[in-house]
Structures are given as structure tokens and as C-alpha cells.
Amino acid sequence: QARNVSLVRDVIQEEDAGVRSRTVEITRDGKKHLFGVIEIPSFYFDYRSRRAGTEYRSVSEDTAKAFESLKAKKVEGVLVDLRNDPGGSLEEVARMLGQVIKSGPVVQIRDGNGNVNVFEDTDGGEQIYAGPMAVLVNLASASASEIYSAAIQDYERGIIIGSTTTGKGTAQVQLDSLAHGQATLTQRKFYQIGRASCRERVFAG
């Protein structure tokens, strides 16, 4: 006999989709060199858990731990891998850039009315990692990935390696309080500190 069963889908926690780090040893001219690699799948931030007042994950905290771990292993440089990273939280990319630069603006956001909001490094000059670094990108690196790469380039903090990026250039606002779910609206464009739109200027190594 057939019957109807109602199921409510819970939030899926993608535990394997967080920041990962590792070391790579390279031998050159008979001398061994140790480098670090940090893989960032997206600029994630658990807004729901933060609003609920419970423990939450964020890419900036996970990346900070990765930098500290690699520093303890005395790596000679770090490669930040942003390949296939579609982007994510603007606040998180600003926090992450604060880990590798001393201070300053990191991106400009302009809305349809011409209002400009500048996101800055707000950690008071604290720099978790000051060593040599590079950023690896590809065609699927978009949005926050491009903001991160652009700021690294603007501050001459490291080199950009890889293919041309997406060139997305737009930012979204998420509405969570709708009666039947959520909606994401594209309302803004983001610009490098040098005023170039990332839709007009994509990044390639």
C-alpha cells in the first residue's frame, strides 16, 4: 500500500570543502627546499550558525591556522591555490588579505546609485604571514578569488600564476528573511583599488 512520507532536508555541512594545507619538498642543485600550499575551495562563512550564536566556520580562520602551521614548519614560501574557487564572502576576503598585508584598502564596491564602499584590512596592522607567496588561478577563479588576486597584485605582495580568471566583477546581496526561502540579488560591482573593474580586467600569470 502506497503512502506519502514528508521529509525536511537539513543543512548539509561540507566538512571536506574547507581549507587544506600541505608542504612540498623540492630539490634543486642538490639542496632541499620546503614550500607550503594552501588550497582554498571557496570564501565560505557560516552566517546561519553565527546568527544562532553557535560555533561557526570561516575561511579566514581556517586560512590563518594554515599559515601558522606552515610557518611552524619553516617553509620558504607559500602558494595560495584559488583554482576553481567561485568566490564567496566579501568580508572574509578582506580578513584574509589582512593576514598577508600590513594595512590598507583591499577592494571598492559600487552600487547602482554610485555609492562606494571601501573594504579595508581592519586587524590593526597584524600580519600573520610576511614571507614570499604566490597565488595560483584558472578560468574558474571568480569573484572573491579575483579580489584576493587583485589586492596581492596591487600591493606587490606576491605573483599571480596560471590562466586568465573569470572576470566576474559583480557582488551579490543575500536576502535570508523571505517567507519561502532565500534570494540572492546582484546589485553591485567591485573594483580594484586602482579603480579597474574586475569584469574589464582579468588576471593571468
Regions found by a protein language model. Name each.
Residues 36-38, 184-185, 199:
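Short hydrophobic-aromatic micro-motifs
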